[in-house]
Swiss-Prot record:
It comes from Pseudomonas paraeruginosa (strain DSM 24068 / PA7). The gene is pckA. One of its GO terms (cellular component) is cytosol. PANTHER family: PHOSPHOENOLPYRUVATE CARBOXYKINASE (ATP), PHOSPHOENOLPYRUVATE CARBOXYKINASE ATP. It catalyses: oxaloacetate + ATP = phosphoenolpyruvate + ADP + CO2. This is Phosphoenolpyruvate carboxykinase (ATP). The lineage of its organism: Bacteria, Pseudomonadati, Pseudomonadota, Gammaproteobacteria, Pseudomonadales.
Amino acid sequence: MTQANNAVYTDISAAQLVEEAIRRGEGELAANGSLVVRTGHRTGRSPVDRFIVEEPSTKDAIAWGNINRPFPADKFDALWARVEAFNNAQDHFVSHVHVGAAEAYYLPVKMTTATAWQNLFGRCLFIEPEQYNPAGKDEWQVLNVANFECVPERDGTNSDGCVILNFAQKKVLIAGMRYAGEMKKAMFSVQNFLLPERDVLPMHCAANIGEAGDVTLFFGLSGTGKTTLSADESRYLIGDDEHGWGEGVVFNVEGGCYAKCIDLSEKNEPVIWKAIKFGAVLENVVLDEERVPDYADDSLTQNSRAAYPLEHVEKRSEKNLGGEPNAVIFLTCDLTGVLPPVSILNNEQAAYHFLSGYTALVGSTEMGSGGGIKSTFSTCFGAPFFPRPAGVYAELLIKRIKAFGSKVYLVNTGWTGGGYGVGKRFNIPTTRGVIAAIQSGALVDAETEHLDIINLDVPKAVPGVETNLLNPRNTWADKAAYDEAAKGLARQFIENFKKFEVSDAIKAAGPQL
């Protein structure tokens, strides 16, 4: 179909999208068959450019602030019309996809992009249904025009690019953004607002299933190990990043994975390595003369990425869903070396650590954060994506854990034997050993030791993991230095938690001085 001599490519195949992208100079083929693209000066999400339209349905329901910035409805209408007119005057690409794998909870989405590669990215990350919108639900529209430049004075944006969610009109406008992760996270934020209304907990987590049907969830910020640890050759992958937990079901919000590529190796991450082939997209990965990806090269960014459909993963849940979780794991990357490799949490501790979301920003996905590593507290292990007040999500989590009897664990994928620069980071095989012990049920009734100050209970033995690692104090040469570091971390937790209005039982479940 054409509009004023411009071609509109609707629901063309992945192979055709690759062909169009290369023909238009949008990217190049790597030796492994993937399409390699560069995203320009933005190599991560841009939180300061993200807005939600303020209207009656959102006015009192959103936690407005630095993360959820309000945008006027009239300004949105003017900008949408401007971007749409601009895009209609050039070739563009349309695909029809679902967001949400469970029949009851999917959103039908018409995704329009100015570039072929971003459409391919959306096809990797969202769900390509056998039949589009069988239930006849109201359609959402994503309009993603990377070559449109916003003018802040005219458009009301913060810069030349923007991401704006409009719940009343079921529209997502993305303009001036080449980093495709914005598209994925925008639709995640949409579901994160809508699902709690249906008594479903939206989660920034990975999920997989064992041979016996047991489900494990892995919560964590980018770089803490969600994708790596859930990609386990002995288990079936549901998904690596975004899920919903309703009564009787855990379902993927997406149909693909978005894996960090920095220092990717076939030995440590075979599932991800094999998934990067024709049909996948590599963002900001450097190629050598033979077009072989050099995953160790971070000259473009620490946040290099691979997008691939779940079909590229051999062992996966065919329907992108499973039952409720036996094990819920909070992954934290602790820079201080204070937290143990694994702690067993009760319900109050689960609520406390879910709300705290303590971790480190590792090779951050956000622009302007630099390549450094720093500690952070990110509520629900994904504060940038949760529009409602944090308590809404925490209450739903505890409700689900209690109803199903899920066991909850805090797993440190960060430092041991000292803080960052002194100690060393837990290696992936050690953490995999911890995860395997959790999934086998070995820790359900394990004998524990209580750690004062940080107020956590750790198992005295974990099959396959060195016992001397389990109590972090034992791994420090200077025990007094450990105690001081523990007090310092406890102070950070206590200070951060002051903003939450919760029961005394939950407050008492955190670190104590």
